[in-house]
């Protein structure tokens, strides 16, 4: 079943990512909506072309109760560059013909042509997962192992799955209401000795929100 397909045309689409977590109190979910634009770029040196994406959105949050929140950030945990964002994750999950041509993939998804939606994200393509010990303190960000949520949140807590699907809903905003420091350059700046371990960027630019 395809939900929300063929709504945009061209080479742009929006998708919702939903994170499902099993807890002793039942399944908890959190989701966020993102926009993707695929386009072709020219290589000045070689004269050839390549493809890229314009991606907008913010981290998905799963409230696990007791002040505990799981964040699914905007980059894939196993990504090798800043280009490995959730736009690429969505293409890999929903477009069986994805071959790293981002514009063509965006066109197929926008048209609902040969895609799978909803689709489960493969564990190797999961986003970077973190939790925040103190919502007012960026140095308290801690990486979470998707295969062992219990280590961060206690017994009986397990990542069930991550699902993406095409949608016509608006892009999610408002993460700054939970993380007041996120758009404050002075509060967000972290000295090297206090930088959280396992987090690619010490100032979190582009990890929690594309608005920085």
What residues fall within each predicted segment?
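Alpha-helical transmembrane signal-anchor/signal-peptide segments
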Residues: 10-23
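Glycine-rich, aromatic-bearing surface loops/beta-hairpins
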Residues: 133-212
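Short consensus segments that form the blades of beta-propeller domains
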Residues: 8-9, 50
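Detector for Asparagine
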Residues: 11, 78, 85, 101, ...
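Structured domain cores in non-transmembrane regions
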Residues: 25-138
């Amino acid at each position: 079943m395809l939900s929300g397909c063929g709504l945009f045309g061209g080479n742009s689409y929006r998708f919702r990512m939903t994170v499902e977590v099993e807890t002793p109190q039942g399944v908890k979910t959190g989701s966020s909506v993102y926009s993707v634009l695929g386009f072709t770029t020219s290589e000045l040196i070689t004269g050839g072309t390549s493809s890229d994406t314009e991606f907008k959105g913010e981290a998905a949050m799963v409230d696990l109760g007791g002040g505990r929140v799981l964040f699914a950030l905007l980059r894939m945990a196993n990504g090798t560059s800043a280009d490995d964002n959730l736009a690429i994750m969505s293409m890999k999950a929903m477009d069986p013909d994805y071959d790293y041509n981002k514009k063509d993939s965006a066109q197929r998804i926008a048209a609902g042509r040969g895609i799978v939606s909803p689709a489960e994200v493969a564990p190797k393509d999961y986003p970077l997962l973190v939790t925040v010990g103190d919502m007012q303190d960026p140095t308290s960000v801690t990486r979470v192992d998707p295969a062992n949520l219990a280590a961060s949140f206690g017994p009986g807590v397990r990542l069930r799955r991550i699902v993406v699907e095409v949608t016509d809903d608006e892009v999610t905003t408002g993460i700054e209401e939970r993380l007041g420091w996120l758009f404050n350059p002075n509060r967000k700046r972290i000295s090297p000795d206090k930088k959280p371990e396992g987090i690619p960027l010490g100032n979190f630019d582009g990890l929690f929100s594309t608005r920085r």
